[in-house]
């Protein structure tokens, strides 16, 4: 039916029998696969968007043929207003198939592990294809991973998805935790996981780092974790940009675990799933100290004397800073 009508009935378009249908099925002008935003507003706005995007020729015969094809195939479904992916050299037939049955383009956005809330807000507010604005975000509330969204998705709606993902992850990890870890509640698990996340980038070390902090909490020792002090100094804005000093260790802040016992009041970043799992399933052992070895790894020990020897040896190798903080867990 479509072939007969388009081929023989569009004489007003300059078509002779068969020519109209040939143009309907012939390769289109789009030189490469391309995403086009099809706005609402009916056939005219759809055709204009296709022409502007280079998917439909800007001449009256093609426009008439395309309009006729829309009408004659209307039982196949409505045309959708969305951002859609059109194939290279797609024919009018292909264009209509995409307009009716194509899936909207989904855009990725990645929240890296270990970002603080202020940094996550920057990532979200600078994403050009999202809409709206968010001004605040509780620390540690979103799960770091890659999310996919449609153009013009509201930032608030995307954050709600991120929060739900974190809630589900925390619930799953908490329900399957090692009871001997001694964690009191999921909130404590997330806070400690955020510190572990910032302490080491090596997944294999995270359960060991978690064990050190859990042992120190159990014994009533201060955590003395550098990332908490950095968070206090920067107000969660990001990197400190310099080495910590002895004076830094003495700042009065509930986030400075050199002066404040126990855990900080909130997470210091959004921990990834691996850090949550590390805290829920810590490595066995009695270690209470660790020091960065300078190659991305750490040296662990249960003895302060041995720890101090490790610190001295590493300072000899790397050179001692004039105002290097005498950290219990780092040189």
Regions found by a protein language model. Give the residues of each.
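Conserved catalytic or metal-liganding residues and their short signature motifs at active sites
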Residues: 1-234, 269-274, 278-286, 294-331
């Amino acid at each position: 039916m479509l072939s007969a009508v388009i081929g023989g009935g569009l004489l007003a378009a300059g078509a002779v029998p068969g020519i109209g249908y040939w143009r309907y099925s012939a390769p289109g002008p789009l030189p490469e696969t391309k995403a086009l935003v099809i706005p609402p507003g009916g056939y005219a706005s759809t055709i204009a968007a296709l022409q502007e995007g280079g998917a439909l020729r800007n001449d009256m015969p093609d426009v008439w043929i395309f309009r006729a094809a829309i009408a004659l195939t209307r039982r196949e479904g409505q045309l959708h207003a969305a951002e859609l992916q059109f194939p290279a050299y797609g024919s009018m037939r292909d264009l209509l198939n995409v307009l009716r049955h194509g899936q909207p383009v989904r855009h990725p956005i990645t929240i890296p592990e270990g970002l603080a809330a202020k940094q996550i807000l920057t990532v979200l507010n600078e994403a050009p294809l999202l809409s709206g604005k968010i001004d605040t975000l509780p620390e540690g509330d979103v799960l770091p991973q890659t999310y996919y969204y449609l153009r013009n998705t509201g930032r608030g709606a995307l954050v709600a998805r991120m929060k739900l993902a974190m809630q589900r992850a925390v619930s799953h990890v908490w329900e399957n935790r090692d009871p001997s870890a001694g964690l009191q509640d999921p909130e404590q698990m997330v806070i400690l996981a955020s510190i572990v996340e910032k302490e080491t980038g090596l997944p294999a070390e995270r359960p060991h780092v978690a064990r050190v902090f859990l042992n120190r909490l159990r014994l009533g020792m201060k955590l003395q974790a550098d990332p908490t002090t950095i968070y206090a100094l920067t107000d969660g804005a990001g990197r400190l940009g310099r080495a910590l000093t002895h004076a830094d260790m003495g700042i009065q802040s509930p986030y400075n675990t050199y002066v404040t016992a126990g855990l900080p009041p909130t997470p210091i970043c959004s921990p990834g799933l691996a850090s949550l799992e590390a805290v829920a399933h810590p490595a066995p052992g009695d270690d209470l100290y660790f020091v960065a070895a300078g190659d991305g790894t750490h040296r662990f020990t249960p003895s302060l004397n041995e720890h101090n020897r490790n610190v001295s040896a590493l300072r000899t190798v790397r050179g001692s800073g004039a105002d290097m903080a005498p950290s219990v867990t780092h040189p």
